[in-house]
UniProtKB/Swiss-Prot annotation:
One of its GO terms (biological process) is translation. This is Phenylalanine--tRNA ligase beta subunit. It is linked to Rajab interstitial lung disease with brain calcifications 1: An autosomal recessive, lethal neurodevelopmental disorder characterized by multiple clinical manifestations including intrauterine growth restriction, failure to thrive, developmental delay, hypotonia, interstitial lung disease, and liver dysfunction. Brain imaging shows abnormal periventricular white matter, basal ganglia echogenicity, cerebral volume loss, incomplete closure of the Sylvian fissures, and normal myelination. Mg(2+) binds at residues 357, 363, 366-367. It comes from Homo sapiens (Human). Its main location: cytoplasm. It is an enzyme of class 6 (ligase). It catalyses: tRNA(Phe) + L-phenylalanine + ATP = L-phenylalanyl-tRNA(Phe) + AMP + diphosphate + H(+).
Amino acid sequence: MPTVSVKRDLLFQALGRTYTDEEFDELCFEFGLELDEITSEKEIISKEQGNVKAAGASDVVLYKIDVPANRYDLLCLEGLVRGLQVFKERIKAPVYKRVMPDGKIQKLIITEETAKIRPFAVAAVLRNIKFTKDRYDSFIELQEKLHQNICRKRALVAIGTHDLDTLSGPFTYTAKRPSDIKFKPLNKTKEYTACELMNIYKTDNHLKHYLHIIENKPLYPVIYDSNGVVLSMPPIINGDHSRITVNTRNIFIECTGTDFTKAKIVLDIIVTMFSEYCENQFTVEAAEVVFPNGKSHTFPELAYRKEMVRADLINKKVGIRETPENLAKLLTRMYLKSEVIGDGNQIEIEIPPTRADIIHACDIVEDAAIAYGYNNIQMTLPKTYTIANQFPLNKLTELLRHDMAAAGFTEALTFALCSQEDIADKLGVDISATKAVHISNPKTAEFQVARTTLLPGLLKTIAANRKMPLPLKLFEISDIVIKDSNTDVGAKNYRHLCAVYYNKNPGFEIIHGLLDRIMQLLDVPPGEDKGGYVIKASEGPAFFPGRCAEIFARGQSVGKLGVLHPDVITKFELTMPCSSLEINVGPFL
């Protein structure tokens, strides 16, 4: 869930009353939100960078509020306040209007070259807007929140906002070779080509995350005004020429991207949130977008639509008994203007342009439940009920865990993700032979693949506890993940049991004895007859030559045990011998 940070005093001023922290927490809960943290800029910096860096930072109290991921209208102070005020019935939901300009309409012309990289664009104008420092900061913050959420880190949509008074329309959205694009980007003092900018921004902590979107494309998108001034090179950076400030009065907003629907939603959210500060409140000046095929369309759409939901459906789904009139009132409090029509059981709901999250009747039912209050819904026994039971595999796992602990082994719980090196190089095998599932864009080198064995996690646990008295006897019973083209997701989980013994001597007899105990618990007798188990000499790159055995049970190989190779011990930063056992638990069900 996205988190919105708002200044407490500014929020209370906008709400028209002061709350205690407990009262505001309760209000958030009633509205379907969560007050995650009460902090300050100074406290945040102090936690992350230390007290020295925090010196001089603001002590203004901040509320960090968790917002549902699909409620884009609550990602800024303006939308949050408006939603809460409507919810508390202090104001009515405003009606957003698109108006045509007194003079010539602003045009954004899309050329056919953009089809190869980011084919869609929409635009609008906020006319005669009045910013303060706090309003301006909120405007910038909303764009960043939208970029991180619905825009999918600018991959689907990128937002550009420009001081219209510094530009001259019509505007052209095209795509050119990087070497042909040259302009002065935001916060720079001279002009650079697009190629130079990409190299510069590779070390920029903020912008480097977006470079991959267009970096390897033959053409880069760019927007010009009629004088050839660059507005932006989406999705990377805006031009410095048209930068907006607190004193900006007319804003040209463009949203470019690969998803037309999301681009329209993003534009609607921005203009509805900040048209409140325009001279004519909640009105947005239209802009015309001309597509490569010659057709044109006017934006923003600011479309209102009607939905019909039966009152008895809402009552049934939520588990309440409310009159249609009361249900309509509840929905109106959730920014969904509603009225009872027809036979008295039908509720007509008007969906405003700010509520792009309302897709189906179930979304309307959910809002009715929130407004009614989850704590007010009476708990009842269902008409039919069943007694839950454990999956056989989980039940067997729990039984084994208790008995492994009784055998003197300590349980460890390690990460399901690990580095390629952990499951391949350190164990003496090639990564291609592991059938590992790879993370496409890992955040750290420690979490690159899903583990194919539990052994590395236990060895790393021992390495982190080398100061503990010997011997160290650890076990883990968890899932590993292996590629499997026969499954719908391309991978399959297997429940493994792994145990290690770390001491001044290898202790193979300890691990062997543990295997015998496990088989006894699983009611698998020794010997090949009658579904028994045997161990046979084997070899493995992770084991010492001649000190490895493969375990066969009920006619199939279920795992290996043995003394680990000195190279494996060294690579995991250990200094003493270690024996291990790892088996697949699944075949014993």
